[in-house]
Design a protein with these regions (language model features):
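Generic, low-specificity signal for short hydrophobic/alpha-helical stretches with a mild N-terminal bias
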Residues: 26-30, 73, 111
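Extracytoplasmic
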Residues: 50-91
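Surface-exposed alpha-helical segments enriched in charged/polar residues
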Residues: 46-50, 116
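Membrane-proximal, lumen/periplasm-facing interface regions of secretory-pathway glyco-
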Residues: 1-46, 63-68
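A short linear-motif detector with a strong N-terminal bias
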Residues: 37-38, 69-72, 106-109
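Generic detector of short, locally flexible boundary/turn motifs and exposed helical patches
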Residues: 22-27, 56-61, 93-95
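Aromatic/acidic, Gly/Pro-rich catalytic loop(s) in extracytoplasmic/lumenal soluble domains
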Residues: 76-140
Length: 140
């Protein structure tokens, strides 16, 4: 129905029909809720550009290549460092279960705290975690 179009915009790729219970039902059943980086919207990039401190180090897991592309295109600030291996300030996770194999190890770190999220009807599409630098440095 037309109502669904309004609710899901701009996340149409996350659509599930009402037979499965919409996106909430799909999420509860373990189905994918994001696919092709569609949750990294211009609004989300604007949020990162405005809210993250200068020279922040970002690990976007399997999405790092997309963040590097956004930097090349001028959609993401150039002072951000995108990394996969070094210590990071922010961990950005696209909620794509099939591509999240190494993520549990990272998310089990005690120095990570939820900083922000992009949600669709209470289902997280993107999660942004911030490193608690005091705990992180104390543990080194």
């Amino acid at each position: 129905p037309a109502t669904d179009l309004v609710v899901y915009h701009p996340y149409e790729l996350s659509y599930y029909n009402r037979l499965v219970g919409g996106i909430r039902g799909a999420y509860q059943r373990g189905l994918e809720v994001t696919y092709f980086m569609e949750a990294f919207t211009p609004d989300f990039m604007d949020f990162l550009n405005k809210k993250l401190p200068q020279n922040s180090v970002i690990n976007a897991s399997f999405s790092n290549f997309m963040f590097e592309y956004y930097q090349e295109e001028g959609r993401l600030r150039q002072d951000f460092r995108i990394t996969e291996k070094e210590d990071f300030d922010y961990y950005i996770l696209l909620n794509r279960r099939s591509a999240s194999s190494g993520v549990k190890r990272v998310l089990s770190r005690e120095d990570l705290k939820t900083y922000a999220s992009v949600q669709l009807t209470s289902v997280p599409l993107v999660l942004v975690y911030k490193t608690d630098t005091q705990n992180s440095k104390a543990g080194k």
